[in-house]
Amino acid sequence: MFKMVSSPHTHSGKLTMRIMLWVILAMLPAMGVQLYYFGFGVLIQAALAISFALCLEGIVTVLRQKPTLFYLSDFSVILTALILAMAIPPYAPYWLILIGTFCAVILGKHVYGGLGQNLFNPAMVGYVVLLISFPLQMTTWLPPIQLLNEPPTLLDAYSLIFTGFSTDGFSLHQFTQSVDAITQATPLDSAKVILKEGVNDNTLLQSPIFEAGFAIGWWQVNLAFLLGGLFLIWKRIIHWQIPVAMLVSFTLLAAITELVASIPYLKTLPHLFSGAMMFGAFFIATDPVTASITPRGKLVFGALVGFLVYIIRFYGNYPDGVAFAVLLGNICVPLIDHYTRPRVSGHRQ
C-alpha cells in the first residue's frame, strides 16, 4: 500500500540543527586564532551573546506560542550570536554585545516571522546598528597581545568588558601605550585614515601591526576562516559560488585599482586577508535564508557583494564594508532570483 503525499518527494537529509552545528564547528578554529592573538575577550563576548540570544529566543517563542525547545534546539540563534560576538572588538563594553544581540534576534529575525522568513542576515543587522550608533566602541581594538608588554589576563578581560578597567586599574587605552598609537584601530581603519592624509602605503606598512605586508593577527584569523569555509564546501554545507564570486569580484577590482589609481592603497592580497573578508565570504554571505537560491543567482549575488565591499573599502567612509555589502546584497536577492531562475523546459519565462 502506497501513501500519496505532496511534493517535494526527496530531501537532502541536512536538518537545520545539523547544518548549524557544522557551521559552528567550522568557525571554532578562527575563534581559537582570534583568542590567541587578541586575548580572552572573544570568549566572554561569545558567552554573553549566546546566553542573551537564547533568553530572547525563548521569550519570543513563548509570546508567539511557538514550541520553545524546538526553536532553541536548532542552534540558529547560537550561530547568529557567535557571528556577532566574533565581529565586534573583543574588549568592547558588555552592553554593546547585548544591544547588538537584541537587534540581531528581534529586529533581524523575529520581526519578519522567525527563521526562514527574515530578509536580512540577522547578525549583520545587529552589527550595522552597533557600528552606526557606537562608532568609537566598535572601532577600538587592542593590538595583537604579542605586541603588548603586559597582555590582559582572563580576569583583566572580564574586568575591562564590565568596568572599562583591568584588575590593576588600567584602561584599554593604557594597554596600548607601549605600541604605536594607530594600533587601537583595525589595520583597515588605520589604512583609511593614514592614506587619506597622503601618506604612502610603504609608510603605513612600517607600523608594528604589519609584518611582511600583512596585518599581524588579522591574516591568521582570515586564513582560519578560509580553511573553515573550504571545509564547509567539502561537506556540502555551503555552495562554492557565493564565496568564489565574491572574492574574485573584489580581487579583480582591487588589483585594477592597485595598478592604475594614483591614490595609494593597501595591496590587494593584504586586503583579502584583513577585516572580515574571509569571514564574510564563507560564513555571512552564504546564509541560505538571505542569499540567492538559484545557481546563477549565487554567482551574481556573490559578485555583487564583492563589488560593494570594494566600493565601500576604497571610496566609502567605512574601512571594511562587508556588513553593509551583505545587507545591500540581501535587498537585491528577490530581483536576482527572479531573473536567474532556471527556465522550465517547454515554457517561456
From Swiss-Prot:
InterPro entries: NqrB/RnfD, RnfD_bac. It is a multi-pass membrane protein. The modification FMN phosphoryl threonine is found at residue 186. Pfam families: NQR2_RnfD_RnfE. It comes from the Bacteria. GO terms for cellular component: plasma membrane. GO terms for biological process: electron transport chain; transmembrane transport. Keywords: Cell inner membrane, Cell membrane, Electron transport, Flavoprotein, FMN, Membrane, Phosphoprotein, Translocase, Transmembrane, Transmembrane helix, Transport. The complex is composed of six subunits: RnfA, RnfB, RnfC, RnfD, RnfE and RnfG. Belongs to the NqrB/RnfD family. This is Ion-translocating oxidoreductase complex subunit D. The lineage of its organism: Bacteria, Pseudomonadati, Pseudomonadota, Gammaproteobacteria, Pasteurellales.
